[in-house]
Amino acid sequence: MEIRIFRQDDFEAVITLWERCDLLRPWNDPEMDIERKLNHDPDLFLVAEVNGEIVGSVMGGYDGHRGSAYYLGVHPDFRGRGIANALISRLEKKLIARGCPKIHLMVREDNDAVIGMYEKLEYETVDCITLGKRLIEDREY
């Protein structure tokens, strides 16, 4: 397995991966999300590759105060092999190198498998409510 920075020719493979991992929502345009990411810290957008096939991804961010992780997904046929852990670990190292003191992420409440994975990586549930507001409407995916 190789973990590397997303390349432009990964576009379709990553969107297909996200579809397989059920990461997409009708109100998020994945193409637009990728384009936006490529304009901000593109080196924090990582993919995992096995035999030339993209089998995992994570999209990281850092705003100078905290890091973030989005679109963490591993192809169902490759789960349980440490790929998600490797992606998060690489992202954490990149954030630490920037002086990032902490990372926050969001997981759907009913996603027990992913919550358990993060807990094994020493992530803790933080007692807060996440609020959001759409500032720009994306086209429906």
Curated annotation (Swiss-Prot):
Keywords: Acyltransferase, Transferase. Residues 1-141 form the N-acetyltransferase domain. PROSITE patterns: GNAT. The lineage of its organism: Bacteria, Pseudomonadati, Pseudomonadota, Gammaproteobacteria, Enterobacterales. SUPFAM superfamilies: Acyl-CoA N-acyltransferases (Nat) (SSF55729). NCBIfam families: PRK03624.1. This is Acetyltransferase ECA0875. CDD domains: NAT_SF. Gene3D superfamilies: 3.40.630.30. It is an enzyme of class 2 (transferase). Belongs to the acetyltransferase family. YpeA subfamily. It comes from the Bacteria. GO terms for molecular function: acyltransferase activity, transferring groups other than amino-acyl groups. It comes from Pectobacterium atrosepticum (strain SCRI 1043 / ATCC BAA-672).
